[in-house]
Amino acid sequence: MTDPKETINIENVVASTGIGQELDLQSVAMDLEGADYDPEQFPGLVYRTQDPKSAALIFRSGKIVCTGAKSTDDVHESLRIVFDKLRELSIKVEDDPEIVVQNIVTSADLGRQLNLNAIAIGLGLENIEYEPEQFPGLVYRLDDPEVVALLFGSGKLVITGGKEPKDAEHAVDKITSRLEELGLLD
Amino acid sequence: MTNQRTTRDGSHGTESVPTQRSRESTDEDHGCPECNGDLVTDEDRGETTCGECGLVVEEDGIDHGPEWRAFNAQEQDEKSRVGAPTTNMMHDKGLSTNIGWQDKDAYGNTLSGRQRRKMQRLRKWNERFRTRNSKERNLKQALGEIERMASAFGLPDSVRETASVIYRRALGEDLLPGRSIEGVATSALYAAARQANTPRSLDEVASVSRVDRGEIARTYRYVARELSLEVAPTDPASYVPRFCSDLELSGDVERRARDLLAAAADAGITSGKSPVGLAAASVYAAALLTNERVTQNEVSTVANVSEVTIRNRYHEILDAGGEPGVEA
């Protein structure tokens, strides 16, 4: 049996940062090649980097959110590209603006089918949310680490809300040990 | 004096009626404590016994009915020990006074014009007094809404009562601000119906509610979490009898559908699948197996799920039920 932790794969990393000055998005959009800015659709300017693949949302307040990256390194890398691009437009950006990771979305696979009904009862109806009429997954909110796990009948799971990659590993550990305790992982 | 005592006893009796009822039903669920046989209640002797082994489970039961026999309406009123039961389904629990609309006195004579105008004024102020603050007006509207939707579904009083209590708790714990009265009332009814094992699907609920499905689902999740209602996931089998009777299918089909659902659950193919879809597909599959013709279209109309869902599920259900190779 493979360790479910080995199947952990980071799907998305969201980080935020700021350049500490207000921007005129209209003129930035004109000068920055490949930028999407449609204030009727979305108030931010969207700039997509290709390598690493990610999307940076640049707001009028000078705050930047980077999403879609596959690792924390990629987030830093793509934000560095964004900063360089802004500097090319002679917008002052300090050397190393603080980058805060807000959310990491991870997927994993327990490797076998799950009986969500039994798990719902086993984990305690007060701790989980399972409404097959509304959503096929079982929502399990953990306190430590503070993440939300979605368990699916196929045995796959999605862990979201973590601030660092370690959180997902802890969560998978916790979930597998809880399910083994309950005898729900044959 | 005696009369007063009996009245008090009587009102005590009414209060215990719901608990008594619920205990009886759990007795039925559990059966005989010795052999798990079915319990039989002998009302003449006031005894509850086991039909299998004869164990007396309860004796000297209390008769909650009115005193003695009554031969006409007047005697019935005189001998009744109880008034109307208090109910959570009314905003004042049914405890307030209503001034009749007929403008007649106790003898049935029409009132004079002067008295009529007085009653009109009293009626107005009584109505204003009954719903003094916004909370009571809120309750009045919500409970009316619950009543309306429950009637549309033909849900029994016990479910309405539960829904009303859930709504009252939501109101008491300040869950209303930011949500609509109709939304919370609808989700209270949805939760109550599920707790009573007579679930109505979200689509059905949305069809009689004044709010849309998305808002009901959101409000329901919020209310269920905040009040820790702990509603277990719906058992698909609880939809089967209703679908079968709507489609005018025999008891045979119903039994077959239940068996198929049990087999599907054992095979572990029901996780994360919508219970409504599973129920509809099992009814369709069971009808095929018993050679009673229904079309996927008919089932989909009754169950409010798409034909595609039925097609996808019923193959899986047939495979799990060990009935492969059956084709429509």
Swiss-Prot record, chain A:
Each Sequence repeat, start to end: 10-86, 101-179
Keyword rRNA-binding among UniProt keywords: no
PROSITE patterns given in the database record: TFIID
Pfam families in alphabetical order: TBP
CDD domains tied to this protein: TBP_archaea
Domain of life (superkingdom): Archaea
Keyword NADP: no
GO biological process, one term: DNA-templated transcription initiation
InterPro entries: TBP, TBP_archaea, TBP_dom_sf
Keywords, comma-separated and alphabetical: DNA-binding, Repeat, Transcription, Transcription regulation
A molecular function (GO) term: general transcription initiation factor activity
Family listed: Belongs to the TBP family.
Function (record text): General factor that plays a role in the activation of archaeal genes transcribed by RNA polymerase. Binds specifically to the TATA box promoter element which lies close to the position of transcription initiation.
Protein name: TATA-box-binding protein E
Organism, scientific name: Halobacterium salinarum (strain ATCC 700922 / JCM 11081 / NRC-1)
Gene: tbpE
UniProtKB/Swiss-Prot annotation, chain B:
TFIIB-type Zn finger ranges: 28-58
Gene Ontology molecular function: DNA-binding transcription factor activity; TBP-class protein binding; zinc ion binding
Domain of life: Archaea
Database matches in CDD domains: CYCLIN_TFIIB_archaea_like_rpt1
A GO cellular-component term linked to this record: transcription preinitiation complex
InterPro entries: Cyclin-like_dom, Cyclin-like_sf, TFIIB, TFIIB_arc, TFIIB_CS, TFIIB_cyclin, Znf_TFIIB
SMART domains from the UniProt entry: CYCLIN (SM00385)
Keyword Transcription regulation: yes
Any Pfam family: TFIIB
Sequence repeat feature ranges: 144-227, 238-319
Organism of this sequence: Halobacterium salinarum (strain ATCC 700922 / JCM 11081 / NRC-1) (Halobacterium halobium)
Name used for this protein in its record: Transcription initiation factor IIB 4
One record GO biological process: DNA-templated transcription initiation
The family this protein is said to belong to: Belongs to the TFIIB family.
Biased composition (Basic and acidic residues): 1-12, 21-32
UniProt feature coiled coil, ranges: none
